[in-house]
Amino acid sequence: MASSGGELGSLFDHHVQRAVCDTRAKYREGRRPRAVKVYTINLESQYLLIQGVPAVGVMKELVERFALYGTIEQYNALDEYPAEDFTEVYLIKFMNLQSARAAKRKMDEQSFFGGLLHVCYAPEFETVEETRKKLQVRKAYVVKTTENKDHYVTKKKLVTEHKDTEDFRQDFHSEMSGFCKAALNTSAGNSNPYLPYSCELPLCYFSSKCMCSSRGPVDRASDSSKDGRNHHKTMGHYNHNGSLQKTQINSFKNSVACPGAQKAVTSSEAVDRFMPRTTQLQERKRRREDDRKLGTFLQTNPSGNEVMIGPLLPDISKVDMHDDSLNTTANLIRHKLKEVISSVPKPPEDKPEDVNTSHPLKQRRRI
């Protein structure tokens, strides 16, 4: 550092306030006009030099003002430092460097008791140990920031690859489901109303039957031959996707190939989709009647109020009050509650025709 006097306490070059930069672009200008000044770690310091403090005995107020930005270790006035008339120069040391940065940024060029403060770093007051510690802290911060940045870049790359894989799987699902739906649409007039033609959808049908083998026997000879033939067609259709897509298709073709077809051929939803409206209503009515008959058949309770399915739950254990009088009172209350619950009448189940006829017709207004 070059200095005008060459001794500690004289005016250093880095203490001089720079002029405001007039060549800065408009979009880069802030609310306050500033000079072009780059601070490296060797120029920053925990020591701050405050110039332009009015010489009216306001050291206490000055320290209280700077203490808002961090803990202050020491402060003193520099009487030998060259200053303007009727002003004083103070040196303040903060506990850490971050507090000194904030104090300099906030208090520089601020009005204080009628004077304009000029705050600058004073690294020349640091000892060798303080400088070594400052550099070590800065080095650790740089290492941590670099590691976080590398971790973020790696994570972003992994997320991008995972997103590409999910997009491919979603496209593959949609295309295969569309292929299965097209095969179901062309399978009108099949002898089995719950399944399409076996020659139209051998791959999906065979894979679904392999995954759900408990539903019934599978004709492995015919289905395997048809599956192989249609599998080559499907793989030929997706050859343009590249070697990566081929590997993914081979890895999960049994679990991903046609999940929509399994749901379509195993449930009656596919049948209802292509049935007329009247047939659907008749089917629903038949199901309701079957459920009603099944409920009547499962009524094992003589009272007919409950339907017993499966093992009975354990009864609620009675609480013992450890007193005959209290137990008698509790039993009376329980019996009374049972009588009240059993005596509540159930609302009559009226048919829709009866409900419609029970309401009186609205009379016309006489004019």
Swiss-Prot record:
One of its GO terms (molecular function) is RNA binding. Residues 217-243, 277-303, 339-367 are annotated as: Disordered. Belongs to the RBM48 family. It comes from the Eukaryota. GO terms for cellular component: nucleoplasm; spliceosomal complex. Residues 46-124 form the RRM domain. Component of the minor spliceosome. Within this complex, interacts with ARMC7 and PRPF8/PRP8. GO terms for biological process: mRNA processing; RNA splicing. This is RNA-binding protein 48. CDD domains: RRM_RBM48. Residues 217-228, 347-356 have a biased composition (Basic and acidic residues). Keywords: mRNA processing, mRNA splicing, RNA-binding, Spliceosome. As a component of the minor spliceosome, involved in the splicing of U12-type introns in pre-mRNAs.
